[in-house]
Amino acid sequence: MIAETIGWPQIAALLVLAQRGAEELYSARNTKALLAAGAQEAGASYYPVVATTHLAWIASLFFLIPATAPISIVLAIAYLLLTVARYWVIGTLGRFWTHRIITLKDAPIIRSGPYALVRHPNYVVTIAETFLLPAVFGAWALACIMTAVWTAVLMYKIGLEDAALAARRQPQLEPTG
C-alpha cells in the first residue's frame, strides 16, 4: 500500500519541505537579528500569501503527482543545479537573507555573486524551481499552473521589495564590489 502511494514525487516533496523548513529557521534567525539591529519590515501582510503559496506547491507535488510518475533525469539534474543557485543566493546575502522584506538603513545593497547578474536572483530561482520539479515527473499542467501563481505572487513581492529599497538605491550608497 505505501509503495503505491509513496514514490519519488512524494519523497521529493518531503525533501523540499525539510529544506524549506531549515531555510525558514535560518530566515527567522536573520530576521530577529536584523530587527534587533534596528531594521524595519516592509509589506508584512503579504507574507502569509507567500507561505501559503509555497506550501500549496509542495502539497501539490505530494498529492497530485502519482507515485509511479516517470522521472526525467535531465530535468532532475537541472533542478539540482537550481538548488546550488539557491544556496549561492543565500550565501551571498548571508545575514541579510530572509523570507521577509527586512531593510537595515545603512546596510549595503548587495551587488556581488548572483546579484551581479540578476536583480532578483532568488525569485528567478524560485520560479524556475516551481516549474522544473513538477516537470521532472511529467506533471506539466501542475508546473504551468503553479508557476503562473508563483509568478503573480512574486511580482507583487518584488514591487514591495523595490519600494522598500528605493531610498537605499542612491548612487552614494551603492558598493563597488
Say what each PLM segment does.
Residues 15-16, 60, 147:
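A short, structure-level motif marking secondary-structure boundaries and short turns
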Residues 18-21, 59, 131:
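Hydrophobic residues within the alpha-helical transmembrane core of Major Facilitator Superfamily
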